[in-house]
Amino acid sequence: MNPLIQELTQEQLRTDIPAFRPGDTVRVHAKVVEGTRERIQLFEGVVIKRRGAGISETYTVRKVSNGVGVERTFPLHTPRVAQIEVVRYGKVRRAKLYYLRALHGKAARIKEIRR
């Protein structure tokens, strides 16, 4: 890769991101712009996948809201996310948890790791 591009991407990488993996429950504080106002919107759910590397890395968070599954994909190093909190660590044996889409209720629970 071009050294100039490498240097620019290194400057934009965030260092305040906690370590989390698929299966973990996270609370994402996303900045939302509505007209001239900017506010923080919380999105809490299970990380079902992480993909990419470096500046282009993304993660997808899934939650069930009013009986409807909602998935939202965030870039990892975006300034549009104010903060990421890890609520609990889950124990899973897969990197992509797409099977959670078909499960409901207690079957969709993930075993918790105590840390």
UniProtKB/Swiss-Prot annotation:
Q: What domain of life does the UniProt record list for this protein's source?
A: Bacteria
Q: Name one GO molecular function term.
A: structural constituent of ribosome
PANTHER family from the UniProt entry: LARGE RIBOSOMAL SUBUNIT PROTEIN BL19M, RIBOSOMAL PROTEIN L19
Gene this chain is encoded by: rplS
Q: Does the keyword Mitochondrion apply?
A: no
What SUPFAM superfamilies would the database entry show? Translation proteins SH3-like domain
Query: Does Membrane count among this protein's keywords?
Result: no
The Gene Ontology CC terms held by the record are: cytosolic large ribosomal subunit
Q: Summarize the protein's role.
A: This protein is located at the 30S-50S ribosomal subunit interface and may play a role in the structure and function of the aminoacyl-tRNA binding site.
Name the InterPro entries on file. Ribosomal_bL19, Ribosomal_bL19_CS, Ribosomal_bL19_sf, Translation_prot_SH3-like_sf
Entry keyword set:
Ribonucleoprotein, Ribosomal protein
Name of this chain's protein: Large ribosomal subunit protein bL19
The record's similarity note reads:
Belongs to the bacterial ribosomal protein bL19 family.
Organism the protein comes from:
Enterococcus faecalis (strain ATCC 700802 / V583)
